[in-house]
Amino acid sequence: MTRVALAFSGGLDTTVCVSLLKEEYGYDEVIGVTVDVGQPATEFEEAQATADAHGIDLHVVDATAEFVDLCFDSVRANATYQGYPLGTALARPIIAESIVSVAKAENCDALAHGCTGKGNDQLRFEAVWRNSDLTVIAPIRELELTREWEQEYAAEHNLPVQAGNDGVWSIDTNLWSRSIEGGKLEDPNYTPPEDVYEWTADPATTTETELITIGFESGYPVSINDNAHDPVELVETLNEVAGEHGVGRTDMMEDRMLGLKVRENYEHPAATTLLNAHKALEGLVLTKDERDFKRHIDSEWAQKGYEGLVDHPLMDALEGFIDATQQRVTGTVTIKFEGGQARPVGRESAAAAYSADAASFNTSSIGEITQQDATGIAKYHGYQGRIANAATETDTK
């Protein structure tokens, strides 16, 4: 008996895939796998209902803790891609690994997903899956199916498809972000209606302000207002608190890996808050040279994270540098929520690379260094440029 493990949500794509894997690919049994990375409970209920109607076994894997751990690694790397905090991208390798584990435990011959041939997720899933000895199947891509064809196929075969949000938008939710795309949003000039947002209040209507303090240890968020939280609880709390102030909305034209531009809307209140706080603490603790060089490292980490290549050998090297810098990133940051913003307004650390006395306008010297000692440096500063400019002026006369 041949058996295939399908990444299963209960939506149109994966529901159609169940039938296609049997009819077109000849598999005897399809096993559905749904991985919990912080989706709403209704999504699991819908997946189970669809699986039951299809008569297939559904395995639900809780990978929430592993996912948030990876998100916290991304905080240490200040990781965003074109301005958004990588929630969807980071979830995919976690989901893919979980599906491989189930497939091996259930003696499956193959792995399957319902991704199209136009998106990023096919690449992220398969980057993980092709490390296994299992066959990889992508029915939607391989059979070149369209959404319209799938809808007709489901209707003709009376397939159980959960309505979800009635197909108005394509929505993907996890603890780190909520993405909204498709439908009228495919028009770059279309203004999203306020009801597409669920996590964040309208920033234009939020009038209250609130201060919170976030604690970090070695670059990892560990507390809110001096109360320790486990990673999952900390993110859940900040999503609620920051979301009430309208924090964490992104409306962007995203450049996908295949070269396509796509209109995306994201909500990510906790991610925005933690990234802003972490950058503020690094600004207090790290030297200028460390901060300048780390920007390059962070950018590479974010790119690999966006591509779903979190196990790439380069990531080990990047993590080595990041880990070395983060040993001193311990302290607290005060964040002010106001008008859709999460703004750092205070930071404190025993490892601060900062001297209030040295920076003060009320002191004339720094130890043995006086203000007059800067005169020689000031004379040399820009000297090469002045010579070059003078030579250019001479040549043009």
Curated annotation (Swiss-Prot):
Binding site for ATP: 7-15, 114
InterPro entries: Arginosuc_syn_C, Arginosuc_syn_N, Arginosuc_synth, Arginosuc_synth_CS, Arginosuc_synth_type_1_subfam, AS_cat/multimer_dom_body, Rossmann-like_a/b/a_fold
Gene Ontology BP terms: argininosuccinate metabolic process; L-arginine biosynthetic process; urea cycle
Binding residue positions for L-citrulline: 84, 120, 124, 170, 179, 254, 266
Molecular function terms from GO: argininosuccinate synthase activity; ATP binding
GO CC, one annotated term: cytoplasm
Localization per record: Cytoplasm
Keywords on record: Amino-acid biosynthesis, Arginine biosynthesis, ATP-binding, Cytoplasm, Ligase, Nucleotide-binding
Binding, L-aspartate: 116, 120-121
Subunit structure: Homotetramer.
NCBIfam families found in the cross-reference section: argG, PRK00509.1, PRK13820.1
HAMAP family per record: Arg_succ_synth_type1
Protein name, per record: Argininosuccinate synthase
